[in-house]
Amino acid sequence: MPAWARYALVLAATAVFVVFAYHARYAKIDEFTGFRMEEMTRLIAGVLAALYALTVAVELHIGRKLNVGAQALLCVVVGLILLAKVSLFDYVSDDYDIFLSNWIYEYSQMGIKQGLGTYIGSDYTPPYLYLLLLISRVKNYPWQYLVKAVSMAFEVLLAYAVTQLAGLQVRGAGKRVVIFNLTLMLPTVVFNGAYWGQCDVIYTSLA
């Protein structure tokens, strides 16, 4: 499939996914009344659509030698994987409830410059704290969704890295996309990011 056709497929598949994401139901959404419900839903759908587009684009790049039907099927598979993970978004882990949410709230009370220079009692490395600082700029929003979305974005990088490493021994686009999808579905990956909202995948993907 030529590159322009892959891009068109990514756009078309993302448009379909946005419809599903927009009409999904999120248990925590009623707790945030700063935005109108429609605005909140659009924001959530936008975040999920960006995740979907990233994942599909990377997977179609890996499977670029597959036929059109196979690539269209990959778009469906990615959508199902992502929707399954989204179903875990409303779970609030103790770590998020006790630590992450409070750190983000503290940052939300500061400006960017002040936040960069303030120690908030965290033992996380500065780059991750900078991500939390950026998340805190989004007011009246379910921050846990963004925390989990960040981890899920790095899951794509992890899956790509694993696929590239496996590609040293495994030949064939079909096998490589299977490895990519299996990595995204590993229990440790799913629970660490979409369920617990942990950031272990970030440094793992960059290792």
List PLM regions with ranges.
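Start-transfer (signal-anchor) and selected internal transmembrane alpha helices
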Residues: 1-86, 164-171, 176-178
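Membrane-interfacial loop-to-transmembrane-helix junctions in polytopic alpha-helical membrane proteins
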Residues: 66-73, 139-146, 175, 192-195
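Generic alpha-helical transmembrane segments of integral inner-membrane proteins
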Residues: 79, 83, 134, 153-157, ...
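Hydrophobic transmembrane-helix microenvironments that flank and shape a buried ionizable site
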Residues: 82, 125, 148, 152, ...
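Extracytoplasmic catalytic/substrate-binding loops of multi-pass membrane glycan-assembly enzymes
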Residues: 89-105, 112, 119-131
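Interfacial juxtamembrane loops and adjacent helix segments
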Residues: 116-148
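Transmembrane-helix motifs of polytopic, lipid-linked glycan transferases
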Residues: 149-170
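Membrane-embedded helix bundles of polyisoprenyl
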Residues: 176-206
